[in-house]
Amino acid sequence: MSNALASAPLDAADYIKSHIRTVPDWPQPGVQFRDITPLLQEPKSLRVLIDLFVQRYIDAKLDYIAGLDARGFIIGPILAYELNLGFIPIRKAGKLPYKRVAQSYELEYGTATVEIHEDACKPGDRIVIIDDLIATGGTMMAGKILLERLGAVVVEGAAIIDLPELGGSKLLREGGLALYTVTGFDGH
């Protein structure tokens, strides 16, 4: 493993965490929503966040950053730009105009589907999937399956926040996906 795949410095991780707002009982009672808006609004905290990801992946010999709909679309293109890589959007069903491949995944009540264009990548391309948060892990696992179906190598899943009590990070690791998260929160 190269030095680019080292952990985030504790002080930077704490700094990032201090810029994430917790909104109690939203979108429903009992949920502690982790709002990254303050992190994005302050130029310094956004720069620290992107620099952490750049430091991690600068020597990883990647071809693309893939971002999960929707907040992965905020961080992913910035990171791709900084690393001089392309960006692959992994969209909710029905949002992509060209030929696409789809993968459904389970939600607490029902299922959802994500899609990518069938020409999004080619066999052997090395990709990191990024999102703001890992909760149940379903969306990121579906993205991994889609990219691997096209022959890509998913090097790692990355997120700003891990909510380990929801089991997503465990599910993803057990499914063979290496993970990197900047910070974590207890609870939902």
Curated annotation (Swiss-Prot):
Record-given protein name: Adenine phosphoribosyltransferase
InterPro entries listed in its UniProt record: Ade_phspho_trans (IPR005764), PRibTrfase_dom (IPR000836), PRTase-like (IPR029057), UPRTase/APRTase (IPR050054)
Alphabetical UniProt keywords: Cytoplasm, Glycosyltransferase, Purine salvage, Transferase
Annotated gene: apt
Gene Ontology CC annotations of this record: cytoplasm
Lineage: superkingdom: Bacteria
SUPFAM superfamilies per the UniProt record, alphabetical: PRTase-like
GO terms under biological process: adenine salvage; AMP salvage; purine ribonucleoside salvage
Top-tier EC class: transferase
Gene3D superfamilies named among the record's database cross-references: 3.40.50.2020
Enzyme nomenclature, EC number: 2.4.2.7
PROSITE patterns the UniProt entry points to: PUR_PYR_PR_TRANSFER
Pathway(s) it belongs to: Purine metabolism; AMP biosynthesis via salvage pathway; AMP from adenine: step 1/1
